[in-house]
């Protein structure tokens, strides 16, 4: 998250005179007014389909539903129709034959001890179970452990600090790759049973040292059991849930976003002040010259190398004014120059704020005051400031419609949000953050369309150095939503908390390692602007699905369909011999990206 601090305007002559000329000559990037790049978000969608529920979701009222809610979020995102049952309701097993899959989202199997024989008989007949939490080590669980692929128990619970892939089962991870939850030296989490698997069990993921199995599949009669042998409540886990569920059947298809977006917060803006000691140390130039001759050329190189389309988030002034009147910034040369260069390189502009004060009102949002930021005097003042920003941007970029808004420091209260949308009805997309923070009241989001039509497109990663938690979350998101969303600030190279002491050469090099990983893992992911990401999320969120396996053909009927949609397909064995209504692109041995161009599609498998 952006460090809270006030900023001051510094001279911009070097930025304008030197930077613009250098970039024009070196890259041939024009900075004359751009044609409109506005994306139409007013699509027409077909009626929803209403499929029969395929999954029984089993939870415990005694244990609570916090963990289960994360699993539910994944099933809903995969558009898996499910029905919830409580283990305390002893009649659930009588209805099991109505479903194809069964998800366990609880740990104490004692409550279903008498039902386990019937459940395993259902598995033998062709049902599939996904165990999403490490079970308690008791007689009920141990009594059926052989059916779950467990040969024996070597001990009780053990600690883990990450995951190691035994085979390539997720996009972004090859066999032998290790991903840590919170760093290699972080305290281990005791959430795993020390078990030995049977020889016939398929092992997919182990602990970071390869010692303890974490995800495996065991065939049992005509059915199967997939076990997750670790329990963590975090958004980073969602992609692992999606992967585990997709292993249950011979083939699994679910909708994805298919998009990669990069945001430049505070750009264009007045050139911020800050500690330029490390810039002076490494380059012998001031901050303005660094932005124009080093930082911005690097950004353009990333666009050229990876096909990135940046979305720049405008800040009009760096002031702490939170009460009308709101003065117009008349120093606009750097806005026009860099804004139009960004537009002409295929990017987009959006709103970040009149200034960098989060939209929270004094007296009603006092609990959201953070750092040195001021609270706004009233919702009316927020509305006036947002109107000023809108008029400022329209004057400078008359052919662009600003549809995307990023809250300053990713903080925004409900009354501030309402004032923003009243002042700027052109805003259709809110892009805040996906991962929670312990030290600030951030505006957390899901990838979804709100009831009022506003599209939420959270950012997952940030900065130049991507830590272990961000990376394992992004790994999960490549497999859950097939999405990458990142933001950085021009002044990251000035902030010690964001790695300034390392120097820009090191910071940019570290970030390129992340980019290399993303684009080698997902080479066909769509590079999108902020509004392009909004459209992709809208198309994803509106989709409904009816799946049916007829012999060797997977038939899919879509509702909430416009002109195209994307899906993840996992093929767990058979050869694919044909398709209708869609095209496939293989990512690894088991996973494919499906591009649907019709509301009915099918994937045909060999014998």
Regions found by a protein language model. Name each.
Residues 233-241, 248-341, 345:
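Active-site beta->alpha N-cap acidic-glycine motif
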Residues 229-232, 251-271, 303, 394-404, ...:
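Catalytic grooves of carbohydrate-active enzymes
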Residues 113-114, 587-607:
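C-terminal beta-strand-rich structural cap/linker in extracellular carbohydrate-active enzymes
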Residues 53-55, 128, 187-259:
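A glycine-centered loop/beta-turn motif at secondary-structure junctions
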Residues 11-17, 380-450:
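Catalytic domains of cell-wall/extracellular-matrix polysaccharide-remodeling enzymes
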Residues 60-138:
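Helical hinge/lid and interdomain linker segments adjacent to catalytic or ligand-binding clefts
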Residues 54-59, 124-125, 132-148, 304-415, ...:
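Metal-dependent polysaccharide deacetylase catalytic core of the NodB/CE4 family, i.e.
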Residues 110-180:
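A glycine-rich, often tryptophan-bearing local segment used as a flexible ligand/cofactor-contacting loop or short
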